[in-house]
Each structure stands twice: as C-alpha cells, then as structure tokens.
C-alpha cells in the first residue's frame, strides 16, 4: 500500500508546476510516479519512464523542494541521461549529470538546490560526458563534489543518524555498478545556458582509454562515494532488465515526442514565444561530437 500523504504531496507539487513551468510539468505527466522503500532509493530517481521516490524523503522536505527535485528529474529525462551512461561508473555519472543540469535549474528555471546540491560555474555549458571525464581524471574535482554532498547529508541527517546512501544502503540492484544498455547510435548533448558549449561524447563507444573506468580515482574509492539527491538510473524494462536495442530506440522516440510537445506548450503560453526547455529541440537537430571522442571510438 502506498503512502497516501506522500503521493498526494507529489501530485500537488507536480500540479503547481503547471502555473510557472508548463514544459517541465508536461514532461512529468509522461512519467509514472512509483513509490519504493528506502533500501531501493533514499531520495528520488528516474529511469526515463518513471519517477521513483522514497515517501519519507518526500514527507521530510518542503513542497517547493519537492517541485525542485521533480524538475531536476525531468531534466535528466529531457537530456536522456538514463540512456547515456554506457560503461561509466554509475556514481560518478550521477555527479556529472547533476553538474550538467543544475546550472540550468538555478539560472533558467529559478529553482534553489537542496543542501548538498551540486553546482559549479566551471561546468556551465558542458555536457555530462565532458564533466565525467574531468571528474574521473581529476581527484581534486571529484573530492570537491563529494565534500559538497557530504556537507548536505550532515545537515539533512542531523540528529537522525547516518543516511542510507552513506552506509551503502538505498541503492537499487542496477546501481551496483553494472553497465547500462548499448545505446546504439544515439546522439544527444546537454544544452549550454551560460558560457561556451563543450562538445558531447555520445553513441555506443562510451568507454574510452582516457576515462579510467576502474574502481579508484587517486585515493578515492568510487563505490564508497555518496549518491546525489535526485538520482538518474539506467533505463530498464518492467522486470528491471536492460533495454533491448529496439526498446532503447522506442524510449528515445517517446522522450523526443514528449520534449517536442513540452516545447510547443511553453512557446504557445509564453508572451514572447520562447521556451525554457534549454534549447533541447535545437540539440536534437544538430549534434556535435568532440574530435577526441571520435578518435577514441576507433582506438
């Protein structure tokens, strides 16, 4: 039986987004709300088809924070993060995805990040793939992210003991570090609301020689680092299995249709005919790939 109070809070938060964030609200209407236990997810997550949430997390935060995390998850779907991890380490990938979207969440959509939320001006305009490469090859940069998350966890868990994420709990089966499904020839990149856009590494050749997909970055044990609030999970089917190539293509098409509809709704309702979808429709039409990544595809 679901927690009715938490479910109603989620519905209410989503409904209120219709007033100021029509595009994001439209995206969220395409995602089923699924309640799970704390040992499956300690905060909130998305796999591209669902919004998965821990009811206690929803009850413990303010409604405006629920809205912020919901939009955060919607942005993961807009930029197809559940389909783009490849062989990258799932925790570092989550951190990279958060850095990629949170600047847009703050500056373009006007939301505040919860304690421990990841944002760094140096990453503005970079894709998740480029940020991942920086984190996986730069121990200091990765440690900065870990410190930010730990500070947030300490404040939010003050007086309530250690969180599930820090103690190794609160991870789904797929978060044990396996590979996400092959995304075929998928190409997609995050938008760049501020600064010079960096090129995106996309497609099926995710693991390149300079990415170090091992278990450590310097002295940092990758499996021991915390997960950020508002996770991105690999896309999966109803049985929790990796998607087939045809299912990946189908989900991509579903997401692109949802983004197109959200973009049109925002433009129709805005005074100046613009949309806050972060230029996502433009990136669907014209994708650029870093020459280094193209070269690595053949090495």
Cite the ranges covered by each PLM segment:
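Basic/hydrophobic alpha-helical interface regions
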Residues: 1-70, 74-111, 117
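Negatively charged
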Residues: 103-299
